[in-house]
Amino acid sequence: MCKGERKLAKIRPFRAIRPVEEKAAQVAALPYDVLNSEEAREVVKGNPYSFLHVDKAEIDLDPALSPYDDRVYEKAGENLKQFIREEVFIQDEEPALYIYELTMQGRAQSGLVVCTSIDEYDDDTIKKHERTRHEKELDRIRHVDVCDANTGPIFLTYRTKDEVKRFISSWKEEHAPIYTFTAEDGVEHVAWKVADESVIVTLVNAFEDIPNLYIADGHHRSASAAKVGLMRREQNPNYTGEEEFNFFLSVLFPHDELSIWDYNRVVKDLNGLSEEQFLKQITQYFYVEEANVSPYKPNEPKTFGMYINEKWYKLTVKEETFDANDLVKGLDVSILQDHLLSQVLEIHDPRSDSRVDFVGGIRGLEELERLVNSGAYKAAFSLYPTSMEDLLAIADAGEVMPPKSTWFEPKLRSGLFVHSLK
């Protein structure tokens, strides 16, 4: 890519650093931000090949050490180099595209593993729907910079294009995969390498007709990758735009294959209110009734489950409560935040208020009951999932969603594809 004119949705092949086939299942790891350090230490017991040794390298150091200590990033870089040296990882000789298919509970999604442009991140061709936090960006900037690589893929989506689907489908049918394994959570992972130049050209050209890509998951990773690329440009003022640091590792999925799960909330107290006072206050904004099933999972938008004192309630928002014409304010996560968590419980900033926590739908509503019954939390709220159409519309409008609006399953595994910035 040169500094002048360019086309939209530029994707390009790359020489992946990736595990040898027989080690792929052991290498593949959940994303760094899904596990805390203690959980990661447990996961890697007996597995020296887990990519968590790169993505969360503090697990190989003194537990008293901060995960943001310089030594953690240095250890990550050392561990990646060691994997390459020991030939746990190889690097493909020629640039290629890759297909990455995940199947969970009978539902498959097939993504194209590519490099995308930091310029398109910067000019909003790659659209966002979340704000990022500086300290989280800084963590991944340091990680990418020291490792000299994008180690975790950015999960991108695009409005479905039949031509792309057809090419991916036919390639899968006609070629043997490079990886196939079922992870411990039952998700099946299969990958193919697309090395045929004519097919690569066809796919690259197909994306030039796609006006936008959208970040589904990985706002901090993408922001960090783009910033490292800009840092490298400053260090290399004669850059051409074709160097690897101008691009970052992404997996592109058609929007209609993705599954957003519920992202639920638990709160530690009722802001000094008795249960009776709390129930009375929320009737300003919601119709409240005892649920006829337990646990209660909302089956349509604008309805919520609430678990308190061993009882489930169904909440239905009153129409006059919110502006139905406002894309963001009309989201279920916004309605709960604006009119219950903020107005009644005075939890105004869910990012920083320790009185609220978030529970991904993968953990089930029984987890909400367990947390409240333990006494650690006073109430739990189950939500109807945000839709893909809402995500795309909000990103198109240049708006941002409230924190913790979307929980995607299945999670992409890290370590199957690494993009070197060299």
Regions found by a protein language model. Name each.
Residues C2-K422:
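Surface-exposed, charge/polar-rich loops and edge strands
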